Amino acid sequence: MFTYKGDIIDCFGFAVYYERDMDTRIVRVNPEKCIPSEIGLVARILRKDGVVVYPTDTFYGLGVNCYSPSAISRAYGLKKRDPAKPLSVVISDREMIHSVAIDIPSLFESLEAEFWPGPLTLVLHANPLIPDVLLGFQKTIGVRLPDHTWLRGLVKTAGFPITATSANLAGKAEISDPVKAIQVFQGKVDCIVDGGITRGGSSSTVVDMTKEKPSILREGAIPSHQLERFWD
């Protein structure tokens, strides 16, 4: 177990920790190569409910075990994020979708075949195993398969999906430069993975697939017209 230093607030019955003065492990990686020793080190931190800042195909993300209420609460506290706002997750492959979502519509197969791996987050009905604190106490979950070799390898090695919230304080700009990520989060998280400057640009596009007709909740890297042709 980790020892927490900082202020504690109540988050719908869960303890949220604002970290201070932790020892942060910096791990520098080649995002195109999955070196087992590097990935294994970070995966072990996640399995122990650690918080990891990691590179993606868009910006840097803040990752914890999506099944651990205490780890999820740490992520909310670090971002100073409204606990009523849910966190999405990243998966390692298409098969992992069933560990986080149920009642998946048939249109899902067309969208994931066209746009995954890539910057598309699909909102689905959440698996009952997912803690309420991750979902903002709703019943849906955002899921993404990233176009990032190292990140997919990390999630596969960890053995569970991890949170995909951007590594920034609530209301602040997303981070694509690892130097900035270290400035913001060193001493506050257990590990920062330096995978170089990420692609940046736009965040992922978010599509709600929980209703009869899908709807775009946020237009991002994938333009709406490329998606709407699948259901209009």
Regions found by a protein language model. Give the residues of each.
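Active-site-adjacent structural elements in enzyme catalytic cores
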Residues: 17-232
